[in-house]
Amino acid sequence: MKAGKFAMHFAIAALVFAGVCSSNALAQDVHSHNSMPQGEMTAQQKSQASALIKIVPQSTVRFQDVTVAQHEGYALQFGCVSGDSAGAMGLHYVNGDLVKGGVIDATRPQIVIYEPTPNGGLRLVGADYLVPVELWNADPTHTSPPELMGQLFHLFDAPNRFGLPAFYTLHVWAWKDNPNGAFVNWHPNVSCEEFNPRHSESK
């Protein structure tokens, strides 16, 4: 499936799932965890990981204001994703053009992640890099999963509850420390309790 069709499927699925993904069901979706635990990293890998965690907030600081992200093409998809035991992923604001581009650039994440706050606002908690598997595999020079500064992406295979083709994804919890690791999919201290579907609207 071409990247444009992937983005279209993303948008269609969002219309179906928006506002209802704060249920437990999505916690059962299985990702392949390829990222190396911090304790097992080499000195070079630790240095790369630290650099990535610094680059993300430097590159996304303007998105602390969600309206800036919206003006730059990011839009809420799938409501607020959470689960009972696995924590939450929060609200994913996706840039369809960046998804279609298929370029992995630490300074230009395809997704920025927010957590709803009690006062009705949104707190920026991280970024997510995403590339469709078919788009990645279409390049004959790609002989392994995508990697960003020493961090291998996780595979979200198809079929899945989103109705999307398989994709690779890498979460970076650069704005809210994750006790389970900066690059895991779920954050135990992110909550969707304050989620309101109106978060998709401009503030």
Q: How does the language model describe each region?
A:
Residues 28-203:
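Primary mode marks residue(s) on the alpha4-beta5-alpha5 output face of response regulator receiver
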Residues 12-13, 99:
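Residues at structural and domain junctions
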Residues 2, 26-28:
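N-terminal acidic, proline/glycine-rich, low-complexity intrinsically disordered segments
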Residues 16-25:
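C-terminal segment of classical bacterial N-terminal signal peptides
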Residues 1-11:
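Bacterial N-terminal signal peptides that target proteins for export
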